[in-house]
């Protein structure tokens, strides 16, 4: 287990959480793990919070592929990325040390805005209007013009991200073993003059989605990358593809993806 000895904790500090993390660090050290203060030195990155904190941990630490991410929920929380509760951290340490875990590999999407440096998303990218006016987007798949969307916005999600914002927009929950990404509409405008598909659709991992923002007053839409807004202005084109970057997480052997979906929603 030498390659898994360095552990880093990512969390939002406050007085109560500082005390809990101090105790977690003590337990880690007592079990032979080396607590590090720089995430780049870690082979295990632990986020403490809900799914949102987990997404931030992955983004803030650079979508590393050479380490294991794991999520710990705070009291009373539930999540799809978090297998452990802050009150049973001892069980997590025992599972890590005795390899009573399974490694999951979550795909990411690559988002390129205006042809510039790409961003990566584990959950989804969304684009929304910032004014009281529909946003107009030409939607192309592999260079083929599929539709012209008018409405509040669009969401492009990974399979694991399908349980987030996309689901609230009537998107499907996608099995993470399916290699592809989902495109969902947010409040599309459909009448005798304007038509869109009116439903979510799923693209194969080899497809390229191109979104062209028509400049009709919506020059500064909100772009959200997972749970963080992008400061980019005057967005004209957004290209989305599946990426080869894979985020490795661990799960308890008796806690499947669909068990977590049921526990979260049903």
Curated annotation (Swiss-Prot):
NAD(+) binds at residues 51-52, 123-124, 150, 152, 163-168, 187. The active site is at residue 51. GO terms for molecular function: ATP binding; metal ion binding; NAD binding; NAD+ kinase activity. Its main location: cytoplasm. One of its GO terms (biological process) is NAD metabolic process. It catalyses: NAD(+) + ATP = ADP + NADP(+) + H(+). Its EC number is 2.7.1.23. One of its GO terms (cellular component) is cytoplasm. Belongs to the NAD kinase family. Involved in the regulation of the intracellular balance of NAD and NADP, and is a key enzyme in the biosynthesis of NADP. Catalyzes specifically the phosphorylation on 2'-hydroxyl of the adenosine moiety of NAD to yield NADP. This is NAD kinase 2. It comes from Oceanobacillus iheyensis (strain DSM 14371 / CIP 107618 / JCM 11309 / KCTC 3954 / HTE831). The lineage of its organism: Bacteria, Bacillati, Bacillota, Bacilli, Bacillales. The gene is nadK2.
């Amino acid at each position: 287990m030498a390659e898994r000895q360095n552990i880093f904790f990512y969390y939002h500090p406050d007085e109560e959480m500082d005390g809990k993390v101090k105790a977690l660090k003590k337990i880690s050290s007592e079990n032979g793990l080396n607590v590090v203060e720089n995430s780049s030195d870690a082979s295990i990155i632990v986020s403490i919070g809900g799914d949102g904190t987990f997404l931030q941990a992955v983004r803030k630490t650079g979508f590393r592929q050479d380490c294991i991410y794991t999520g710990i929920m705070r009291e009373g929380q539930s999540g799809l990325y978090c297998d452990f509760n802050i009150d049973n951290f001892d069980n997590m340490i025992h599972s890590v040390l005795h390899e009573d875990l399974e490694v999951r590999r979550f795909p990411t999407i690559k988002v390129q805005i205006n042809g510039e440096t790409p961003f990566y998303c584990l959950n989804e990218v969304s684009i929304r209007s910032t004014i009281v006016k529909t946003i107009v987007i030409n939607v192309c798949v592999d260079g083929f013009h599929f539709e012209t969307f008018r409405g509040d916005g669009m969401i492009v999600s990974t399979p694991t991200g399908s349980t987030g914002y996309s689901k609230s927009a009537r998107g499907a929950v996608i099995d993470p073993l399916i290699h592809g990404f989902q495109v969902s509409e947010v409040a599309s405008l459909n009448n005798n003059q304007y038509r869109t598909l009116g439903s979510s659709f799923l693209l194969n991992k080899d497809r390229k989605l191109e979104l062209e923002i028509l400049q009709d007053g919506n020059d500064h839409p909100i772009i959200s990358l997972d749970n963080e807004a992008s400061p980019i202005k005057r967005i004209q084109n957004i290209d989305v593809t599946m990426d080869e970057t894979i985020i490795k997480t661990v799960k308890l052997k008796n806690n499947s993806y669909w068990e977590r979906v049921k526990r979260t929603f049903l």
